[in-house]
Amino acid sequence: VSTWLEKCGFPTPIKDASEPTVLSYPGVLAHSLAHLIMTRLSYECGYSLPSICDRIYDLPDGRQAFLVYTAESDIMGTLGGLVDFGDGPKLEELVKGALQDAIWCSQDPVCIGRVVDAAFKQAACCHKCLYLPETSCEWMNTHLDRATIVGNKDRSVKGINTK
């Protein structure tokens, strides 16, 4: 099936049972941004966090992407609210809000000061800023780093939302 999907031009998920379970640094950035957007969607759309899931993709041209979707089959799982936020100005406001949310964590400076471990499974992340219910996260809340978004406390790393 995966060969057929690849031939048809579908992006392949980064996580593959036959591959090591480690994301690249751009994948960690995409994963962290996905979690911020999912949390913001929960506030904006009224979806519960356990009903929103993510999927991280490695595109053939080397770029990273993520998919945010609902996993519920009841009324909470309809795509109407998510589809509405995927269009133009609403999407822009959603992303801006998510990036704004990343600036501060109630566990700082401890959270943002964490050093990346050798397997890059844990870095600047915690239950207050990036962790989601584990049923929502394909990677079980590993490979997350808020510093990829806002930079770190000693400014040795610049995030995408750093001025």
What does each model-found stretch correspond to?
Residues 1-163:
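C-terminal accessory domains/tails appended to large, multi-domain proteins
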